[in-house]
Every structure is written in C-alpha cells, then in structure tokens.
Regions:
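Charged, amphipathic alpha-helical interface modules that flank catalytic cores or transmembrane segments
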Residues: 1-97, 105, 112-120, 124
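Extended hydrophobic
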Residues: 9-13, 32, 36-40, 45-55, ...
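Hydrophobic, repeat-rich solenoid/adaptor surfaces of innate immune receptors and signaling proteins
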Residues: 84, 105-108, 113-118, 170-178, ...
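Post-nucleotide-binding-loop coupling segment downstream of the phosphate-binding loop, primarily
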Residues: 103-169, 175-177
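Conserved P-loop NTPase "ATPase switch" module shared by AAA+ and STAND
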Residues: 161-192, 218
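Substrate-gripping "pore-loop 1 plus following alpha2 helix"
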Residues: 183-199, 227-231
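Sensor-1/coupling segment of RecA-like P-loop NTPase cores
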Residues: 199-229
Length: 355
C-alpha cells in the first residue's frame, strides 16, 4: 500500500496513510458513496498533493535540456561514429523491453553504446533521459534528486507521465564513479535502488515498460557488493537485467579506421590501438612524429600532453601557464574526489580554459 500511495501522491506516505485512517474513523461518511470529488476535496483540506498529471508541460523541456547536457560530453573518433555489433545487442534488448547493464573496462567504448541507444530512441521517438551520475549525483531520495534536476517529481514518475502508453528509456551512466568520487556513495546507491523499485512498480501497471540502462566499469560491477546488489533478483516484481559487455575493437575495424599504415605497426601498438580511447588519442597526435615506442596507454597520454603544451605557444599562450593550469585542475580533482571542476572556482583565465 505504501508503494501505491507513493505512486499517487507527492505528499509523505505517512501523512497520506494517516489521512485515510482519519477519513474512515473520524469523518461522518457512514453509508455515503465515496466519490472522486469527496476524496479530492478532503485531500485539499488536508493539504495533501496528488502526483503529476499525464503530459505535464514542465517535464519534456527539462528532459531535452538534461539530454543535451549528456550528449555534449561525447567525443567520437575523427573518422566519425563507428557502428559496432554490441550496439545492435543494446537495441535488441530495448526492443524486447529488457533493462541493461552495459559493462566494460575504462576506454572500451561504453559511451558509444549509450550514444547508439540515444540515436535509436530519437529515430523511433521513444521518450528517454540520460544522466551522468558523476555530474548529477543522486542524494537524499528520488523525489529530492528529481527536484534538483528540475523536475516536479522523481525521474521515474516524471518520464512515466510523458510516456504512459509507450516505452521509455532511462540511462544512468558512470555508476562506478559513485564508488570512487563520493564519500557518501552509499546514499547515492540507495537512491539508485529506490529509482529501480519505482520503475518496477510503475512497470507493473504499464503495458509498455520503462527500460533502465546502467553503465558501469566491469571491475566495479564484479567487485563492489553495493553496486552488484542493485541488480539481484529477490521477488517477482524485480527487473530482469541483461548484461552487455563492451570489448576492444576487432583488428579489421582498427585497420579500416587507420588505413594501410596499420599493417606496418608493431603487434603491441596494434593491440594498444584496439582500445577505443587509445585510438582517439592516437588520432590527435602529430603524424610527423614516430610512435612505434608507444606501448602503453601512459605513453600515448604523455605524448599527447606534451604536444598540447608545446603547441600552446601557437595560440599565444605560455607553455608554463598551460602546465600550471593542468596541475591546478589535477590537484583539485585529487583533493575533492571529483571528476570535474566548477569553472567559477577554478581561478583560471578564459584563454587557458578555452585552449
């Protein structure tokens, strides 16, 4: 009954429950027909608020803003968005109304999967929302988090109201970041669990299901008990999760992207470039130099970092200033346990930030 009250009312469950008891025990309703008007008037007097109405006009514009914020952070390869078979697996799961856990090592292309899902949702006009949990950290409870995101209710209830008769998709990315960046990660994960339960309950009432997509590094999914406990099935209402693992590029995929020169690379460099994030870095390196000795991700990043600093002079900036900016950012992230730094407290010049 608590879930049903939470579904219908935005006021605290205990307050609504007590109001129902008072209506039965204290009000003069014996022998009367209980109509919607009687209940509505009674709840208004008790200052109890109903939840959102279908197609609430406040929701869709805010969903678009949140999705735009999410997609701004995706950087494809220079050759463009590369279609991969794992994308088809994600789309198939969604068409079968299966909620998904996308896992993979860092840099393996999990964001490519979410980009493919978002493209599919837009093409098929499926209501959807995508959130990076390291930027929009869950806190307190679903209702409070939803308000902070700019919604009149929780994410689950909000998207339910704009998609009651069709499928909808909720993407929650960077689940593993809650473990590494938040001192109170248990609270954030509790909110995620509450959201899952809300979707489970809403789906019980829906013909077309809300589908949840979580994105998490394989290591954290397999080794963090708090994270993998989110997906354990314990009763009949529980969601059936499909885990889709993202791996490195196939050799022929990398060859097609790089071209004929790929055949001349050492085997270790070939394997290194099968990791999508490494290939992205390699594409931004000055091709006039030789990179045969780059055998680890660290080597690639070091080359790229030095190139960025070296070329800063062509933008009218001092190399020392760029080094100082990067050092300041890294120190802030290390001390705060965050993955980003607010611009207003960075004390970094506009020219350096733009560069």
């Amino acid at each position: 009954i608590n879930q049903y009250i939470q579904f219908l009312f935005s006021t605290k469950v205990e307050t609504v429950y007590n109001a129902f008891i008072s209506l039965i025990v204290k009000e003069d309703i014996f022998g009367q027909e209980i109509t919607q008007i009687i209940l509505t008037n009674y709840f208004q007097k008790q200052e109890i608020n109903f939840r959102l109405q279908d197609n609430d006009e406040r929701i869709s514009p805010r969903i678009q803003e949140i999705n735009q914020e999410y997609r701004e952070n995706f950087n494809p390869l220079l050759s463009g968005f590369v279609h991969r078979k794992v994308f088809d697996d994600c789309i198939e799961a969604i068409t079968n109304e299966k909620s998904i856990i996308i896992s993979g090592n860092a840099g393996y292309g999990k964001s490519g999967c979410t980009e493919a899902i978002l493209n599919y949702c837009e093409e098929e006009k499926i209501p959807h929302i995508a959130i990076k949990l390291d930027r929009r950290i869950p806190h307190k409870n679903c209702e409070s988090w939803g308000h902070d995101l700019g919604f009149p209710s929780s994410i689950a209830h909000s998207i339910h109201c704009v998609s009651r008769n069709e499928n909808a998709v909720i993407i929650l990315d960077q689940l593993d970041a809650l473990r590494w960046t938040q001192a109170n990660s248990s609270e954030a994960l509790t909110v995620c669990m509450e959201l899952i339960r809300q979707v489970e309950y809403l789906n019980y009432e829906r013909n077309k299901k809300i589908i949840i997509v979580f994105v998490c590094r394989t290591y954290d999914l397999e080794n963090d008990n708090n994270i993998n406990s989110l997906f354990k099935k314990q009763d009949t209402l529980k969601i059936d999760w499909k885990t889709i693992k993202v791996d490195v590029f196939e050799d022929d995929e990398v060859k097609e992207i790089i071209g004929k020169n790929y055949e001349n690379f050492l085997p270790k460099l070939k394997n290194l470039l099968r990791i999508p994030s490494n290939l992205y870095i390699w594409q931004h390196l000055d091709k006039k130099e030789v990179y045969e000795k780059c055998l680890t991700t660290y080597h690639l990043i070091d080359k790229w970092f030095k190139q960025i600093c070296r070329k800063s002079t062509t933008a009218g900036l001092q190399e020392r200033a760029i080094n100082e900016v990067i050092k300041r950012i890294v120190n802030f992230l290390d001390k705060t346990g965050r993955l980003y730094i607010p611009k207003q407290i960075s004390n970094i010049g506009e020219a350096e930030l733009d560069y």
